[in-house]
């Protein structure tokens, strides 16, 4: 016989874990951790010393951009992700204040320390204006590219901070991250099909269908993996960069299951968690192999 107390305890634990994950996703803490993961991955793969300041800057900029976006997209979220819309309506103003404060702090620290690239910290504000206010998200596929490029600037920012902007490793990670995030952005649009149609936003899934979006994204992921292997085989990149193929494998596994009825945790935790996964794999290989 099953122990009722144990079953109830397991259900309670499961509910608690789900509640915590939803909080991390809806509050943008998890997506901010994901962008920090990109910075950490870049630092280790490019053999740079780990410092806290660039990580803080990335975290603060992400929290600011995504929290503002929650407010500008709240009408779409009411249909696509009602739980997130409810969270934003109830707690969003507190997280908005937090995001703005962190962003101002990051800019202030950069200026105070005399960082040469401090002016580039205004790029997140430009992204917010273009994407959320300027109507870029209504342009077919352009919004996916903007998201991809925004994430791709993280390796560039890390490279600039350490004076390695033109190194092959940094440039490779810029292209790689930009491409992989663009693919993820297309997959993300699958959950937003109905809301995007209502708002008149044209995306790959609502123009060609979710099936075509999954197939094209999977093909693109395989092509990226093949390009990585080619660069390594040609001696342009170290064999250490084979580790990024772990993310291609991860992405290839979640793409087939991306449907419009998947909950916010699938997209906000599983899909957005791809870079956290890659960071963990990179750290493990650095510790155990290299």
Question: Residues of each region from the PLM?
Answer:
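C-terminal ends of transmembrane helices
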Residues: 66-79, 127-140, 185, 189, ...
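Solvent-exposed interhelical
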Residues: 58-109, 179-227
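Functional transmembrane core segments of multi-pass inner-membrane proteins
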Residues: 144-197, 211-214
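Intramembrane alpha-helical segments
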Residues: 83-163, 254-263
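Haloarchaeal acidic low-complexity proteome signature biased toward cell-envelope/secretome components but also
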Residues: 1-26, 262-272, 287-290
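Helix-coil boundary and interhelical linker segments in multi-pass alpha-helical membrane proteins
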Residues: 37-57, 105-119, 154-175, 227-240, ...
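Small-residue-rich segments of transmembrane alpha-helices in multi-pass membrane proteins
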Residues: 33-39, 86-94, 145-161, 206-212, ...
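Extended hydrophobic alpha-helices typical of membrane-associated regions
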Residues: 81-87, 236-290
């Amino acid at each position: 016989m099953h122990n009722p107390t144990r079953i109830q305890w397991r259900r309670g634990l499961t509910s608690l874990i789900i509640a915590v994950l939803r909080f991390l996703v809806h509050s943008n803490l998890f997506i901010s951790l994901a962008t920090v993961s990109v910075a950490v991955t870049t630092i280790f793969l490019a053999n740079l010393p780990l410092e806290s300041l660039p990580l803080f800057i990335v975290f603060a900029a992400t929290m600011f951009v995504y929290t503002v976006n929650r407010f500008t997209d709240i009408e779409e979220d009411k249909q696509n992700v009602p739980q997130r819309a409810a969270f934003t309506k109830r707690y969003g103003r507190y997280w908005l204040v937090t995001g703005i404060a962190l962003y101002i702090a990051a800019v202030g620290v950069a200026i105070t320390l005399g960082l040469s690239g401090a002016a580039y910290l205004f790029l997140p504000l430009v992204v917010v204006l273009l994407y959320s206010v300027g109507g870029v998200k209504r342009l077919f596929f352009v919004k996916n590219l903007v998201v991809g490029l925004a994430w791709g600037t993280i390796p560039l920012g890390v490279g600039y901070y350490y004076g390695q902007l033109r190194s092959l490793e940094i440039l490779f990670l810029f292209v790689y991250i930009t491409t992989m995030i663009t693919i993820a952005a297309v997959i993300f649009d699958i959950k937003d099909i109905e809301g995007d149609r209502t708002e008149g936003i044209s995306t790959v899934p609502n123009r060609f269908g979710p099936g075509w979006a999954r197939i094209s994204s999977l093909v693109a992921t395989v092509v990226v993996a093949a390009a990585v292997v080619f660069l390594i085989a040609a001696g342009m990149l170290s064999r250490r960069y084979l580790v990024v193929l772990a993310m291609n494998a991860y992405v290839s596994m979640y793409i087939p299951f991306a449907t419009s009825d998947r909950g916010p945790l699938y997209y906000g935790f599983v899909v957005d968690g791809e870079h956290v996964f890659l960071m963990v794999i990179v750290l493990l290989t650095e510790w155990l192999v290299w």
